[in-house]
């Protein structure tokens, strides 16, 4: 859904992330709804972790084991891209986003949290 939003002419990464989550949550297919909910949780959970780790830990402790397993899988998948290559790639991508008019660059991904909170 994120890439489809780009194809529809939305350049902003944060708006595409938000629209992908919102569209997935509104979908009739429970797999898509779960995917949207999980991505929303990841974005919101990361923000909560930075703001209030104790509250994040309480919330996380209440998640079903199946959800925790999916979160571990998600984390393991993305951790394989950590290191020098990831650092260089992020720097290049940040520059590209700024050249497309996104003044926050790669930090613009955090704006999805503000959009989710405002919408829901």
Question: Where are each of the predicted segments found?
Answer:
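Pan-zinc metallopeptidase signature
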Residues: 65-120
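Catalytic glutamate of the conserved HExxH
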Residues: 2-7, 18
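Soluble non-cytosolic domains of exported or imported proteins
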Residues: 7-14, 31-35, 83-86, 107
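An active-site-proximal "capping" alpha-helix that borders the catalytic cofactor pocket
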Residues: 11-28
């Amino acid at each position: 859904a994120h890439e489809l939003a780009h194809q529809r002419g939305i350049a902003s990464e944060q708006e595409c992330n938000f629209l992908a989550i919102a569209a997935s949550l509104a979908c009739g297919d429970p797999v898509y709804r779960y995917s949207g909910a999980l991505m929303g949780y990841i974005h919101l959970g990361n923000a909560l972790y930075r703001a209030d780790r104790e509250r994040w830990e309480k919330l996380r402790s209440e998640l079903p084991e199946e959800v925790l397993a999916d979160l571990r899988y998600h984390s393991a998948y993305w951790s394989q891209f950590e290191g020098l290559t990831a650092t260089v790639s992020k720097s290049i991508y940040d520059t590209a986003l700024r050249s497309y008019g996104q003044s926050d660059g790669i930090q613009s991904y955090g704006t999805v949290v503000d959009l989710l909170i405002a919408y829901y």
